[in-house]
Amino acid sequence: MESKGASSCRLLFCLLISATVFRPGLGWYTVNSAYGDTIIIPCRLDVPQNLMFGKWKYEKPDGSPVFIAFRSSTKKSVQYDDVPEYKDRLNLSENYTLSISNARISDEKRFVCMLVTEDNVFEAPTIVKVFKQPSKPEIVSKALFLETEQLKKLGDCISEDSYPDGNITWYRNGKVLHPLEGAVVIIFKKEMDPVTQLYTMTSTLEYKTTKADIQMPFTCSVTYYGPSGQKTIHSEQAVFDIYYPTEQVTIQVLPPKNAIKEGDNITLKCLGNGNPPPEEFLFYLPGQPEGIRSSNTYTLTDVRRNATGDYKCSLIDKKSMIASTAITVHYLDLSLNPSGEVTRQIGDALPVSCTISASRNATVVWMKDNIRLRSSPSFSSLHYQDAGNYVCETALQEVEGLKKRESLTLIVEGKPQIKMTKKTDPSGLSKTIICHVEGFPKPAIQWTITGSGSVINQTEESPYINGRYYSKIIISPEENVTLTCTAENQLERTVNSLNVSAISIPEHDEADEISDENREKVNDQAKLIVGIVVGLLLAALVAGVVYWLYMKKSKTASKHVNKDLGNMEENKKLEENNHKTEA
């Protein structure tokens, strides 16, 4: 006869076996966990009062059970089965909640909580799902450049270590790129690591670019599922250099065209609007049908006025794409006749001409001894004051640095001319004798007393201005003397004498020579007097005309009055005659 304990064990074994076959209990329940986190699986059963123990198992793909944890309700002890993949990873709490640390992809199973009583086994299955967030997508193997109208690989978008696998999407300027035949080709593939069971997703984009893609950002994203639902991670932006052919050629001139003058260096610069820009061009010079092959610049040195004309440049492989510009080489010629050092005699005529030839209207300025003249000089009869340094200067205002100047150094020579004057001092105690000399080069003056031949050294001289100066002596002669003034320069020696009476004998004084400065003042005064006289004559003429008109009107009015008075007298006489006849 069997014991009561043996009977209980056989009953428990039968119940466990039947539980593995019939699986009574609650419906499906899912626990989501992130990769590497701790999986917490609650036992979704109410603990019965006659509970003997609780147990956890998972099911293999073929449905066979694998027990992993046991907890007795009476002994309060916990036992973990010898399952290598869960060694040191399990924890079973008092309420029979199972915790699995360091979640792995292999933990995606159907776990079952089992509560066993003496007469029954209760089960609650739970599905465990493990999710792994993929790495941030990255665009790799990027093209160095994209060419318009050519389908070319733009790059690969890669996202690694995902579970489950995700999807990759490409964007242009934030808008989704969809496959388009001949323009957008997207190739997607995924690979699973056999050890970690994590996925790597790769999407290759082939793209036909246009100029509209210049500076446009391209990105990609990975969409995946996590414990809390669907999420998306975006890559960094990638901007590509877009190559496109040249559609227009332009030509530039350095320095600016309006400032080119003879002697300058001209640099022609040809530009194409393609990317990359053309590095070589053909340059066409005026009158030359064949182009000169060069880089994007061509330099002409020391240009002359005959370089004026149309300059062109074109693409080497497409000569019809051409640009042109007109260049004017500005020039300025100045001819002064005569020029340099010129010597003429006083009274001579000297025509002077300053001829200008320029690419534009030029301004002409005359200077004499660094003082600007109001008009160009003209000499019909040279004077000493005409001597000096003359400069004819011209410039093109629009062209910086284009100016010319020629100079004329005029020397006016003349033989010495002498005029002597004398004047008695108002006190009557001395006489002033002046020798006025005119000539160039400056004559030397010497005073002597005729007869004795004595030389007078005590003299006073004025400054030498415009070929004139004077020498003055003051004497008190006790008897009549004759003074001689000698003036000499490289041209001639001139002598003049003057008789001077003794101081006791009164005589007529001669007027002093008028200096150039005083002469100008006299001329100005004469002009003023003439102006005043002319003004008075005009005023008198106007007054005479007004008076004549007034008198003419007065006479006409008088005639009308006399006529009226005569008529009145005649009428009066007629009336008297009529009265006499009636009587």
Swiss-Prot record:
Residues 562-583 are annotated as: Disordered. Keywords: Adaptive immunity, Cell adhesion, Cell membrane, Cell projection, Disulfide bond, Glycoprotein, Immunity, Immunoglobulin domain, Membrane, Repeat, Secreted, Signal, Transmembrane, Transmembrane helix. Glycosylated. The keyword Cell membrane applies. Residues 569-583 have a biased composition (Basic and acidic residues). One of its GO terms (molecular function) is signaling receptor binding. CDD domains: Ig. Residues 245-328, 333-409, 416-501 form the Ig-like C2-type domain. Residues 550-583 are cytoplasmic. Glycans are attached at N91, N95, N167, N265, N306, N361, N457, N480, N499. InterPro entries: CD80_C2-set, Ig-like_dom, Ig-like_dom_sf, Ig-like_fold, Ig_sub, Ig_sub2, Ig_V-set, Surface_Rcpt/Adhesion_Mol. The chain crosses the membrane at residues 528-549. Disulfide bonds join C43-C113, C157-C220, C270-C313, C354-C392, C435-C485. It is a single-pass type I membrane protein. Cell adhesion molecule that mediates both heterotypic cell-cell contacts via its interaction with CD6, as well as homotypic cell-cell contacts. Promotes T-cell activation and proliferation via its interactions with CD6. Contributes to the formation and maturation of the immunological synapse via its interactions with CD6. Mediates homotypic interactions with cells that express ALCAM. Acts as a ligand for the LILRB4 receptor, enhancing LILRB4-mediated inhibition of T cell proliferation. Required for normal hematopoietic stem cell engraftment in the bone marrow. This is CD166 antigen. The lineage of its organism: Eukaryota, Metazoa, Chordata, Craniata, Vertebrata. The gene is ALCAM.
